[in-house]
Amino acid sequence: IHIGGAYGDKKATLERWIDNYYKLDSNTQMRLTVENDDKENMYSVKELYKGISEQCGVPIVFDYYHHKFCTGGLSERDALNLAIKTWPKGITPCCHYSESRRKEHLDESIKAQAHSDLIESTICRYGHELDVVVEAKHKELAVLNYKY
């Protein structure tokens, strides 16, 4: 889940989110994850860690591409490590990977956050075992064409 809107007060928004989280049944709570946002004024991995994971233990799905837009002052490696820290022992952390459609098509009119058709770069896992969800317009074809 993307926390999304800050509504002018990130702290209060996170508190409301946590209040609502505790209204969910335990089966739903066990399956819930949060993901870092792709806009600078939204939620970084660091903000999710302090505002959600430390409070109620919800794991963070690290999105590599979103991190480029909303770093929270952390390097990619540090943000990934912080997200991994939120996952329960024995569960492989999940992350999302996508690339820029704007760069792929050399077209500045394309929205900066738009996903590319295929994946061209090597996904840097920094030595971690991860379940990587590829987010690309060509779906399975992007996975089949990926060179690692």
Q: Where on the chain are the PLM-derived regions?
A:
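Sequence-level detector for tyrosine residue identity
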Residues: 7, 21-22, 43, 49, ...
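Active-site acidic/histidine proton-transfer and metal-coordination neighborhood
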Residues: 1-59
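Conserved, mostly hydrophobic/aromatic
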Residues: 32, 63, 132
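Active-site-proximal loop/turn and secondary-structure-junction residues that shape catalytic pockets
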Residues: 3-7, 36-40, 64-68, 99-101, ...
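Histidine-acidic metal/acid-base catalytic patches
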Residues: 58, 69-148
